[in-house]
Regions:
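Sec/Tat-exported extracytoplasmic proteins
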Residues: 4-8, 21, 38, 50, ...
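Acidic (Asp/Glu)-rich catalytic clusters
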Residues: 10, 34-42, 69-73, 127-128
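Short secondary-structure transition/capping segments
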Residues: 19-22, 56-72, 97-102, 123, ...
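Aromatic- and acid-rich polysaccharide-binding/catalytic face
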Residues: 19-23, 30-61, 65, 77-88
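A beta-strand-loop signature enriched in Asp, Gly, Thr, and Trp
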Residues: 59-111
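Aromatic-rich peripheral "rim/lid" segments of glycoside hydrolase catalytic domains that contact
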Residues: 90-121, 125, 129, 137-181
Length: 181
């Protein structure tokens, strides 16, 4: 944090400092530990990962309340800085997908339209709670010839903004949706 602040003092660039925690159910406990116990308060934004598969906070009303409570309690801006939702249960390669179509959230089928609805509703829930931004995790991580120690391809290509041929999916529209502020 001090390195960023030192850089900012001598630059026209003023980066924001985000502290990032995984999953909404951990956010208050973690932020309390960081601020009250460790005394770290010099940051601008509390960043949250939200993956429905690993979260116990999945109802939009609960997401809104969690973000609102964090904003009020810690007097910091809050963003969802990692999220994703699958558009298909299929795979374009032999690499097992991390999030499969069998893990759908009620009301959000694992389809192109379901992915768009999920992202639109999640973004509105975040905004309704006072959140200031949404970042989608790896929207371009389509299959490729990339080989890692586990396999060749992508374990995420069913969560991207592009189909298996590279064509943009409807989910991109969530960024231009008219939200209620």
């Amino acid at each position: 944090i001090s390195a960023v602040r030192n850089f900012s003092s001598n630059s026209s660039v003023k980066p924001k400092i985000i502290l990032h925690v995984a999953q909404l159910q951990n956010s208050d406990w973690w932020a309390n530990g960081v601020t009250s116990q460790a005394g770290v308060t010099d940051f601008d934004i509390l960043g949250l990962s939200h993956y429905f598969l690993w979260s116990t906070v999945n109802k939009n009303t609960d997401i809104t309340k969690t973000i609102s409570d964090l904003t009020t309690k810690y007097k910091k801006k809050v963003m969802i800085v990692e999220t994703a939702y699958p558009w298909t249960s299929q795979s374009a390669d032999g690499y097992n997908n991390i999030i499969s179509g069998q893990n759908a959230v009620d009301g959000y089928p694992v389809t192109k339209e379901g992915q768009l609805k999920y992202m639109t509703d999640l973004t509105q829930a975040m905004i309704s709670g006072g959140g200031v931004g949404m970042i989608y995790w790896e929207p371009c991580w389509i299959t490729s010839n990339l080989k890692d120690q586990w396999n060749t391809g992508s374990s995420w290509e069913n969560n991207t903004f592009f189909d298996f041929t590279g064509k943009p999916l409807p989910v991109i529209k969530y960024m231009k949706h008219r939200y209620t502020f």
